[in-house]
Amino acid sequence: MQHARQHRGRRVRRVGTPLSSIQHIKQGPSEEAKRQHIKRLRMKKQRAQHAQRSHRPRTNSPRTSGKSPKNSLRIQKPIRDRWAAIAEETQRIVLGDGQYVEERIVPAVSSAVAQSYTQGSSFVDPLISSLKALQMQPAHIAHNIFSQIQLSRQGTIFFPHYSDSLANWATAQKRALPTLSQTNIKFVHDSTLLAARQLAQSMSSNTSRIGVLSFASPKKPGGGFLHGGDEQEETIARLSSLVASLTSPAAQDFYKEHKKHWSEDGSGLHDHSMLYSPGVVVFRADGDDEEINLGDPVGGAFISPYQIDVVSAVPVNAAAVRAKHIILPSERQFFEDGIRGAMKERMARILRVFEEKGDKVLVLGAFGCGSSQNDVEVIASLWAELLSF
């Protein structure tokens, strides 16, 4: 993005994230008074909205309807403390020896069933006896994912903001891929990792790998996952080996580039750099995975490991862009078009990375529609446009 600033009586242009749609607009004295008035009204409205949001329970936290705000916060704190404890244990496993024990509940049949087949004094229906004698018992299964974690960490690839292979996504010669009979697009109201696990269960070992988009923090690996955060990337980091990749040497370049662009631009558009983490191991269940968690909304139960390929990219922080600029009603569409243009470029590069790496089964999601406040209809339309490109 290019924008102009007043500096010692002259106009200076600073180059940041390339987006021409959002620029400062030259203002006259009468316009300035109008802008300041609108800004005061908007700030008052934002403060009211922020106060309302601070007392609103999170959608993927346990339901707290009918509770007072204070009671809701008291309910959520233990949940977040448990998420933080799970995240710390996950990090110890991932950055340690990679070993954990899965507890799986399996059916067990008592010896009475076997005896019924050998007793000849009276007839015993084997099916009825089996159902009566059926019990459930825990089975403990040890897993060692150390080697796969190291492969994922070593295979992590950094794609810089000025990546020629990604910047030319619209005109690049596409690699020859096997012709598919059809492309299936499915909309589900599930978490990212629940959708990924269901795909992993339905796919045979010789089919395509699963690509997952992670809505990355521009500042630190996994965002606030160690503090009980439950944003999308934080959840993935809490339940998988992603943190090993995000702390790799390649990832350090990713965070350095974001810091550099933020210091140059600072508008919330962020840059187009991204990470590709192959073979990330998922070994814990998400909170909405009722098959595993049996109604516990916290999640985190150990499961049999499966692998996903993760692209970590930072969405445009639309909320920050709107807050940074004084936007008149007549200018609103101008700014929204700029945000849309930046998101389209970033999302196209994400798909290009998956295409280059051969990931044909993707879990994408509402990229940047949480705290970044991108419009969900805009993001859906962009995915539709790019997937049919």
Where are these regions (language model features)?
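Macrodomain-like recognition of ADP-ribose-binding/processing modules
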Residues: Q2-L362, A366-F389
